[in-house]
């Protein structure tokens, strides 16, 4: 149904939308979920890299039978990154490690939402996703959280034109 609706929008407007289902599941099911999403016409698949683990992101990204891009989502990251005395830095987890796992796109929070993400961390996550790093391809930043047409120009100013906007809540609330 989603892919048919996306195709109808394209025919009417000339703008292409990509359906990106969440395939996060038990580890033994994620790869099959990716294959099934691809068979059903999804243009991308999302895995919660925190809940499922970046190893699962890597397994799907490296599987030759999965030809659609993989988006690694960040839900739950705060439990690992927000303690100033323990854990892991969000720029390392969501930026560099997500990229090393092979994610084509990496979701991160926005400084324009109610979540208290520091601007410095936001910019360092994007930098780690996109900076030159040996022969690794960049990971496309997917900025989400409080995204709407009013703050899109600021995000493009912060991140550049090579950015995906995670507008799930904005669409659902419309």
Language model features: what each stretch is:
Residues 30-35, 40-168:
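Catalytic alpha/beta core domains of metabolic enzymes, predominantly
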Residues 15-25, 111-119:
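Glycine-rich phosphate-binding "P-loop"
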